[in-house]
Swiss-Prot record:
Pathway: Carbohydrate degradation; glycolysis; pyruvate from D-glyceraldehyde 3-phosphate: step 1/5. The keyword NAD applies. The keyword Oxidoreductase applies. It holds the Pfam family DapB_N. D-glyceraldehyde 3-phosphate binds at S139, C140, N141, H195, G196. The lineage of its organism: Archaea, Thermoproteota, Thermoprotei, Thermoproteales, Thermoproteaceae. Keywords: Cytoplasm, Glycolysis, NAD, NADP, Oxidoreductase. InterPro entries: DapB_N (IPR000846), GlycerAld/Erythrose_P_DH (IPR020831), GlycerAld_3-P_DH_AS (IPR020830), GlycerAld_3-P_DH_cat (IPR020829), GlycerAld_3-P_DH_NAD(P)-bd (IPR020828), Glyceraldehyde-3-P_DH_2_arc (IPR006436), NAD(P)-bd_dom_sf (IPR036291), Rhodanese-like_dom (IPR001763). It comes from Pyrobaculum aerophilum (strain ATCC 51768 / DSM 7523 / JCM 9630 / CIP 104966 / NBRC 100827 / IM2). It is found in: Cytoplasm. Homotetramer. This is Glyceraldehyde-3-phosphate dehydrogenase. It catalyses: D-glyceraldehyde 3-phosphate + phosphate + NADP(+) = (2R)-3-phospho-glyceroyl phosphate + NADPH + H(+); D-glyceraldehyde 3-phosphate + phosphate + NAD(+) = (2R)-3-phospho-glyceroyl phosphate + NADH + H(+). Its EC number is 1.2.1.59.
């Protein structure tokens, strides 16, 4: 059984830890926390060994948490590391620790692409991560983009160019110091936003431009996409592609899905941990084909969309399973929607 160490136990790290714990071919060797807060105590209650930085050992002991060791001890106890640190900290960890230990590491999309050898999305380029030392799972928005575009391309729908407009959530639900509160902020004001070039690190030949604004919500991002297709395709063919592809959910207005809030409420009603929705929620009614032009809207749950990607990245790097077997295994273990999906 593969031993996975999680560096960072915040919004993404704690979700990845729970996902690893749900697998039958990997287990948590431990998690790294810098602060002995409630999340650290929850990690202990979950049965995870908690590690910290060398200068934090006494701080944890005073808080009543006996650390299992330092970050170097965690790396030594692991076959692979998933670094879910805040933005840019992953690169610092690489230079300070990971290079020395020469073990594979999965980074997150908050890091620049050059931190890793490969930027990763399971549907798009699973095989490229095989045997790599450093792999980066792209950000939530980029994961949403690459997943939607890959869904079409895997089903024979060719894309000439993509123009995607993103309404980014202003903050995660627990982030009390971020915003905006009463504003719409170009994020960035320049074109393109970083999401398009980031998507090109995975889908290297795609012609894509993105624009983004930050809006005063916390639940999800909304993408509005215009795609120019290379050929003539029907609306039915596009919808069938989404219906068959794993990690895509078709939300119907007639079934009560009129907003992103209702997507999250659906996740809660399903009993999903933390109300997570790792699937991309494509609004079926928005899918419109006009000649070779395709229009659609879809929601991206920023807290959870990358979680299954990280599990697949571990398998891809270590060669634990081929692409479709890994994706199916991950989806079933995390209780994602698998009915009607085609794995292969």
């Amino acid at each position: 059984m593969i031993r996975v160490g999680i560096v960072g136990f915040g919004t993404i790290g704690k979700r990845i830890a729970d996902a690893v714990a749900a697998q039958d071919d990997m287990k948590i060797s431990g998690v790294l926390k810098v602060t002995p807060d409630y999340e650290a105590k929850i990690a202990v209650e979950r049965g995870f060994k908690v590690y910290t930085l060398p200068d934090g050992l006494d701080k944890f002991k005073k808080a009543g948490i006996e650390p299992a060791g330092t970050i170097e001890d965690l790396i030594e106890a692991s076959d692979i590391i998933v670094d879910a640190s805040p933005e840019d900290v992953g690169r610092e960890n690489k230079e300070k620790y990971y290079i020395k230990f020469n073990k594979p590491v999965i980074f997150q999309g908050g890091e620049d692409a050059d931190v890793a050898e490969v930027s990763f999305n399971a549907l798009a380029n699973f095989e490229e991560a095989a045997g790599r030392r450093y792999v980066r799972v792209v950000s939530c928005n980029t994961t949403g983009i690459t997943r939607v575009l890959s869904s079409l391309m895997l089903n024979g729908i060719k894309i000439k160019k993509a123009r995607i407009f993103i309404a980014r959530r202003g903050a995660d639900p627990k982030e009390h110091k971020k915003g905006p509160i009463n504003d719409v902020v170009p994020n960035p004001v320049t074109v393109p936003s970083h999401h398009g070039p980031d998507a090109q690190t995975v889908l290297k030949n795609i012609d894509i431009v993105t624009m983004a604004v930050a809006v005063p919500v916390t639940i999800m991002h909304m993408h509005m996409a215009y795609l120019e297709l290379d050929g003539s395709y029907t609306k039915e063919a596009v919808i069938e592609a989404f219906a068959k592809t794993p990690r895509i959910f078709l939300a119907d207005v007639g079934a009560g899905f009129q907003s992103l809030a209702q997507i999250i409420e659906y996740a809660r009603d399903l009993g999903r941990p933390r109300g997570d929705f790792p699937e991309v929620a494509v609004f079926r009614d928005s899918v419109t084909v006009n000649g070779n032009e395709l229009y659609l809207m879809y929601g991206v749950h920023q807290e959870s969309i990358v979680v299954p990607e990280n599990i697949d990245a571990v398998r891809a790097v270590l060669g634990l399973a081929p692409k479709w077997r890994s994706i199916e295994k991950t989806d079933k273990s995390l209780k994602l929607i698998t009915e009607g999906k085609r794995y292969g």
